């Protein structure tokens, strides 16, 4: 563009037009002036072709009185039409660019100086940065267009000039003496390559210092994926299976790689930091971070895989933000392909998201590329984040783990265990989840809607609400090697086959998923909303006197301090009255006053929503609630009786709620809870027997409300058992039992005024039946029909009798007895309007 008089004239005109808007300055002009030998020819080198950057350099040289890059310069007999060149050669007229080729100007300079020992030349690397460094920039709009490591197109460069051009900075680096390189006597070609290498390293180091490190592995990694042995084999198999050429199959693999891979940029991380800092301060009253010190220790020397619970679309943004603010590398995040949409998908990808399809079934090539991508992340030590629950929990419970990503991780580790892997559970507890209103329909029983990032925008109108605080608790890490040592002691010496799928993989992966879920629940953050929901949803009319509620909340806190759920569980500050005030301030509680005091209650909408927050901590209160349930039908029980019934029911509660204590620990933990009950006046211990308080006493009310925490769960168990016993041996399949349980639960929810759709959630019945099979209480015959052990009858008439009121048991048995004649009608008969009260 500038290598002829006419082109220089055009260039000068363009430069003047550019500077109608652009304002530039040189960062370190004094250091350049001190090191420059003005008696020697000067050549400027820019990293890549850019007319706008050349114009800025030319303007700064003119301003500083330096030789201009666009004017001719001579070195001995060599006459160059311009005193600059690009390290990456300019494209030809067809747009082709040989990135590995040497700049012609540099080659001619080396040749000339090699032949004329008396001559010399100086090369000055020059970098142009549009706008401030990401570290200094506070405008999210400007950060979107700030310099990055990504290849910049013409449109983006134009936008960068328009948005950032008023703060353009030019950095002249120390001159490189070309004669000193030639004196190494390495020959012309090697000297040129050495000069190129020095310049590449220089530009990379300078760019790192100014805009931050190059966090993206995308440019090189995707091309490398298709050359890995397992992917090459998958490409060959794809070509043979689809009757296409290997080249086409390889091109398809490359497309998959580009679809999957993240494109980390420091600029995007800074953009998200600026935007999210504003967002958190705008929405939340604060973010509490607990136990991050353990993560900072374990991050050194381990491949860290963060496994958070999934309650909101902002979970991954929040976690990446907190890790970055605490000096930890933000992870590469597994995101559903539905989030890979224009603008949003690009920003998420540059913030570390890699995208995965919902199913890999029927696409072995995609599976191979995805597995290889994750294997590369793991072995290179990039931190990774994925959600073992799969999708967001719409009910507030910990969902059953989806083990696909865990299986890929396990297989990768079996393939190469040089980089040890550690799973870090992260519990994110919201006092008010951002998408709460969008969950209301599903909490009322509507079918689950397809996930979309636009769910976030649907709640913009509700941002005037108070969202309280967020707690982020890091749980106990799980070291994968230690886990495998316990599960498969000889895993290191086993023959694993070419696909690294040992026979024990599925079972071990399932146990790993359960352990991750338990560790997540151990790190729960109990907040005021959880406790208020727990108390009010345990009442018949969803209402309590304010003082009675304060006593109930104080009881919850006292019990959890006396018998901590785990060292990683956190509790709120303040007493019961302070917690009530906090929840009232968030407009989640309604209040009515009379002469006797204040009555606190839940309106219809908040009653449904509060089931979500109760479910967050259901696992923490399940065992003490079960113990309290024993004393609803019995006024006195011995320790042996309590332990016998607890052992009968606990495995099913533990399996559904991922409770942390093993059966071996159960006796000790039960004793601790019973001691706490005695200390709080909920029970008395006399003559080796535990006695409940008088039914008219305040303590009996507290004990009763505590017992209601797991009432619906125990009722579901009893439903399934009653239907099985009334069906007889080998007469019903698991699928038929699920359907009947769902119909029966729907009917009972209408009869008893329950507005809690999880009461008739088919997946919960399915899991209970599966647990009965695992406990060998049930068995399947060859036709898939269920037979049961005598223990099932004992479970129904022994344990259930102790924990469920007689009227509830009678109602369930009556519906179960009429299942044959009434099941079909119950499924289709019109339902009366839902009652006003819900719990």
Swiss-Prot record:
InterPro entries: GPAT/DHAPAT, GPAT/DHAPAT_C, GPAT/DHAPAT_LPLAT, GPAT_PlsB, Plipid/glycerol_acylTrfase. Its EC number is 2.3.1.15. GO terms for biological process: CDP-diacylglycerol biosynthetic process; fatty acid metabolic process. The keyword Magnesium does not apply. Its main location: membrane. It is a peripheral membrane protein. Belongs to the GPAT/DAPAT family. SMART domains: PlsC. Pathway: Phospholipid metabolism; CDP-diacylglycerol biosynthesis; CDP-diacylglycerol from sn-glycerol 3-phosphate: step 1/3. It comes from the Bacteria. One of its GO terms (molecular function) is glycerol-3-phosphate O-acyltransferase activity. It catalyses: sn-glycerol 3-phosphate + an acyl-CoA = a 1-acyl-sn-glycero-3-phosphate + CoA. This is Glycerol-3-phosphate acyltransferase. GO terms for cellular component: plasma membrane.
């Amino acid at each position: 563009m500038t290598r002829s008089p006419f082109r220089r004239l055009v260039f000068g005109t363009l430069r003047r037009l550019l500077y109608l808007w652009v304002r530039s300055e040189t960062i370190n002009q004094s250091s350049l002036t001190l090191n420059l030998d003005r008696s020697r020819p000067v050549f400027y080198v820019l990293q890549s072709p850019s007319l706008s950057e050349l114009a800025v350099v030319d303007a700064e040289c003119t301003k500083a009185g330096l030789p201009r890059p666009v004017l001719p310069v001579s070195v001995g007999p060599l006459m160059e039409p311009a005193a600059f060149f690009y390290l990456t050669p300019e494209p030809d007229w067809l747009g082709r660019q040989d990135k590995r080729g040497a700049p012609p100007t540099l080659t001619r300079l080396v040749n000339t100086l090699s032949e004329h020992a008396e001559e010399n030349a100086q090369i000055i690397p020059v970098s142009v940065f549009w706008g401030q460094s990401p570290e200094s920039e506070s405008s999210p709009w400007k950060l979107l267009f700030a310099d990055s490591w990504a290849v910049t197109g013409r449109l983006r460069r134009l936008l960068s000039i328009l948005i950032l051009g008023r703060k353009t900075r030019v950095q002249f680096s120390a001159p490189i003496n070309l004669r000193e390189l030639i004196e190494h006597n390495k020959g012309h070609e090697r000297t040129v390559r050495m000069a190129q290498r020095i310049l590449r390293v220089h530009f990379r180091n300078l760019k790192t210092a100014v805009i931050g490190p190059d966090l993206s592995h995308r440019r090189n990694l995707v091309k490398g994926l298709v050359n890995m042995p397992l992917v090459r084999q998958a490409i060959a198999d794809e070509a043979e299976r689809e009757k296409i050429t290997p080249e086409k199959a390889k091109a398809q693999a490359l497309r998959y790689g580009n679809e999957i891979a993240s494109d980390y940029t420091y600029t995007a991380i800074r953009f998200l930091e600026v935007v999210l800092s504003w967002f958190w301060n705008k929405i939340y009253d604060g973010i509490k971070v607990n136990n991050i010190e353990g993560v900072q220790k374990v991050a050194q020397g381990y491949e860290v895989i963060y496994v958070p619970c999934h309650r909101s679309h902002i979970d991954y943004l929040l976690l990446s933000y907190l890790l970055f603010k605490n000096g930890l590398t933000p992870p590469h995040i597994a995101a559903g392909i539905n989030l890979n949409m224009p603008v949003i998908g690009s920003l998420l990808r540059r913030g570390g998201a890699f995208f995965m399809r919902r199913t890999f079934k029927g696409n072995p090539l995609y599976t191979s590329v995805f597995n290889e991508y994750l294997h590369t992340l793991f072995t290179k030590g990039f931190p990774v984040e994925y959600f073992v629950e799969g999708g967001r929990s719409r009910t507030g419970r910990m969902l059953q783990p989806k083990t696909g990503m865990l299986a890929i991780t396990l297989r990768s580790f079996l393939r190469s265990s040089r980089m040890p892997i550690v799973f870090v559970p992260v519990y994110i507890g919201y006092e008010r989840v951002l998408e709460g209103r969008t969950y209301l329909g599903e909490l009322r029983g509507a079918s689950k809607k397809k996930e979309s990032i636009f769910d976030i925008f649907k709640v913009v109108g509700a941002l005037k609400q108070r969202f309280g605080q967020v707690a982020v608790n890091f749980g106990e890490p799980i070291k994968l090697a230690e886990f495998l040592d316990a599960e498969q002691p000889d895993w290191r010496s086993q023959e694993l086959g070419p696909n690294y799928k040992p026979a024990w993989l599925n079972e071990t992966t399932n146990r790993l998923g359960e352990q991750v879920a338990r560790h997540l629940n151990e790190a729960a953050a109990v907040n005021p909303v959880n406790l208020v929901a727990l108390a009010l949803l345990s009442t018949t009319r969803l209402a309590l006197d304010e003082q009675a509620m304060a006593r109930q909340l104080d009881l919850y806190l006292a019990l959890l301090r006396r018998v901590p759920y785990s060292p990683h569980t956190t509790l709120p500050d303040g007493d019961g009255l302070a917690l009530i005030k906090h929840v009232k301030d968030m407009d989640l509680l309604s209040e009515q006053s009379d002469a006797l005091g204040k009555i606190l209650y839940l309106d219809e909408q908040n009653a449904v929503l509060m089931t979500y927050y109760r479910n967050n901590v259901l696992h923490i209160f399940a065992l003490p609630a079960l113990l309290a349930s024993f004393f609803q039908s019995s006024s006195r029980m011995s320790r042996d009786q309590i332990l016998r019934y607890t052992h009968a029911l606990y495995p099913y509660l533990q399996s559904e709620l991922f409770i942390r204590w093993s059966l071996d620990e159960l006796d000790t933990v039960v004793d601790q809870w019973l001691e706490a009950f005695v200390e709080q006046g909920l029970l008395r211990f006399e003559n080796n027997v535990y006695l409940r308080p008088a039914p008219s006493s305040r303590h009996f009310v507290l004990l009763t409300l505590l017992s209601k925490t797991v009432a619906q769960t125990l009722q579901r168990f009893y439903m399934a058992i009653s239907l099985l016993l009334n069906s007889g041996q080998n007469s019903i399949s698991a699928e038929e039992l699920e359907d009947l349980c769902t119909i029966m639960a729907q009917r009972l929810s209408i009869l008893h005024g329950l507005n809690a759709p999880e009461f008739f959630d088919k997946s919960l019945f399915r899991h209970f039946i599966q647990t009965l099979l695992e406990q060998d209480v049930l068995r399947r015959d060859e036709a898939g029909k269920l037979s049961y052990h005598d223990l099932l009858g004992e479970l129904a008439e022994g344990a259930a009798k102790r924990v469920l009121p007689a009227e509830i048991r009678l109602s369930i048995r009556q519906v179960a007895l009429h299942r044959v004649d009434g099941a079909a009608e119950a499924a289709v008969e019109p339902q009366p309007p839902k009652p006003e009260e819900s719990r």
